[in-house]
Each structure stands twice: as C-alpha cells, then as structure tokens.
Amino acid sequence: MMTLINTKKRYIVAVLLVLIVSACGKMPINGDLDGRWQIMKIEYASGEEEMPERAYYSVALHTINLMKVDVTSQTGNMEYTGDSLFVVMPVSKVEDLLPFGMNGTEQRFGIKELTSKHLVLQSDYARLEFRKF
C-alpha cells in the first residue's frame, strides 16, 4: 500500500514539474527569424555599400531591437508575414535608424532569404545581409 502511495506521489510531482517547466517561457512564433542577427552588409539603392561594425537586429515575438554596441539601442514593433517584415519604430528618430538600413520609422522589408543562419532583407531603400549571431 505504501509503495502505491509513493508511486502516486512521484507521478504527481513529475506531472507538476513538467507543467511548471513548460509554462516558464514563450515559444518562438517567428521560426528561423527569431534571435539575434548581425548586419554583415548594407547595399543602398544608390549603389553604395556599407559593412557596419557590431550592428544587430534582435527579433522576439512581436518586438524588434536594433542595437549598435556602445552607440545606440532602438526598440520597436514588428510583424512577420512569411515573405515580409513590417517594422514600426514609434519613438525613434529617422537619423537613429539610418545605420540599420532604415530610412523611416515605418519600414517594409521583403524577405529574400531566411535560413537558420542567414537572412537577406530588401526594402526600397536598401538590401541588408545578416548572419545569425
């Protein structure tokens, strides 16, 4: 009888642990897009190219963070539709977004390539190439 009670207690504890662990975090909703991406190259529509140092896009849920290490960090909202990425940076200034390949506080990017390691975004203003960091 005691063995049956101990077995039931262990079963209940195991179920509770599984429930607690599974409830602790948000699952990624954007597939391969979620994570931190380092900008490797920006090709502007004008033909100019730039290879920024230590500039990143971080994507999680419906939030995007643009960060240039020791310089700036901008946070906004984004919507991922599979072939497009819509970014809205409501409190940012345009001049703060230029180093990230954006020329406005609202930007639509076409997703030209997306794998677990490589991302290419295209807007009317620039083409951005990233590697997963």
State what each model feature region is.
Residues M2-V13:
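Bacterial N-terminal signal peptides that target proteins for export
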Residues D32-G47:
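Tryptophan-anchored aromatic micro-motifs
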Residues K132-F133:
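Short, solvent-exposed mixed-charge patches
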Residues R108-E129:
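Short, exposed beta-strand-loop hairpins at the edges of beta-sheets
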Residues G25-P28:
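Bacterial signal peptide processing site
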Residues E49-S92:
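N-terminal glycine/threonine-rich, aromatic-flanked beta-hairpin/loop signature
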Residues I20-A23:
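C-terminal motif of bacterial Sec signal peptides marking the signal peptidase cleavage site
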Residues V87-K112:
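An anionic, turn-rich surface loop/hairpin at beta-sheet edges
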